[in-house]
């Protein structure tokens, strides 16, 4: 669990995710503030259904994306690449996620956009602060962790 712990700790300090979806051969990416749930290994985001990325996602879709900082030197590069699934939350599941999201981002209380979950199935964390090109990999279904 050391790999997932290190990844989760870093993700908890960030706040913007980029994710990409595809539909019928067309790709589209979007950015949003996120809340990371370390227990579920998932991001929670708000986005309107009328957006291009939400329309392409439908109620559920495959997704890939990144979270990264903006360091000015290569030695400080840290970032996550991931793949998983995005889905729109409904009912109590949505309500609970929205409450947690609003605690992290109080301004979101004024938004009515639906809550979406990005469930991560594979994560690659690059952390050059541990040595140039240092990578850690986590896979949900196999429980595999690679350093």
From Swiss-Prot:
TM segment ranges: none
Name by which UniProt lists this protein: UPF0306 protein YhbP
InterPro entries with a match to the protein in the record: Split_barrel_FMN-bd, UPF0306
Gene: yhbP
Top-rank taxon: Bacteria
Origin species: Escherichia coli O81 (strain ED1a)
Family listed: Belongs to the UPF0306 family.
Matches recorded under HAMAP family: UPF0306
